[in-house]
Amino acid sequence: MKTILVVDDEFDILTVWRLLLERHGYAVRTASNGAAALELVRSSRPGIVVSDCMMPVMSGLQLCAALYEDPELRDIPIILCSAASDIPVQPNPHIAYARKPLSFDRLLAMLVRMGG
């Protein structure tokens, strides 16, 4: 079973995506900001990270940079989501970008494409 870490500061998004992903056979962990996500990744490496871009404490961009700086974590696939029309491109080749609002069907398709 593939483990997905969903990172978003909106509780409703965390709850809905967790429930839907679990119904599709995924194990799901959640975090409300990049700093909490980084702790979870270091304690239990997920198969894929799905992260919002703009969050308090540590943004999704900062999370992506921190993961890329760690040689043991840099190959974790990441789906970085944002309502903004332009997200600064990260040097990590394992990042896919998604525009919010992101439908669950599109999320599932992206997960499958990224090996989830």
Where would I find each of the regions flagged by the language model?
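Receiver (REC) domain active-site loop signature in two-component systems and cognate sites
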Residues: 55
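Acidic catalytic/metal-coordinating carboxylates
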Residues: 32-36, 59-63
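C-terminal output helix
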Residues: 102-115
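Short hydrophobic/Thr-rich beta-strand motif most characteristic of the beta2 strand and flanking loop
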Residues: 25-32, 40
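Charged docking surfaces used in two-component/phosphorelay signaling
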Residues: 15-23
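Hydrophobic/aromatic residues positioned on beta-strands within the core alpha/beta folds
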Residues: 81-82
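Active-site residues of response regulator receiver
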Residues: 8, 52
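Active-site beta3 strand of CheY-like receiver
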Residues: 44-50
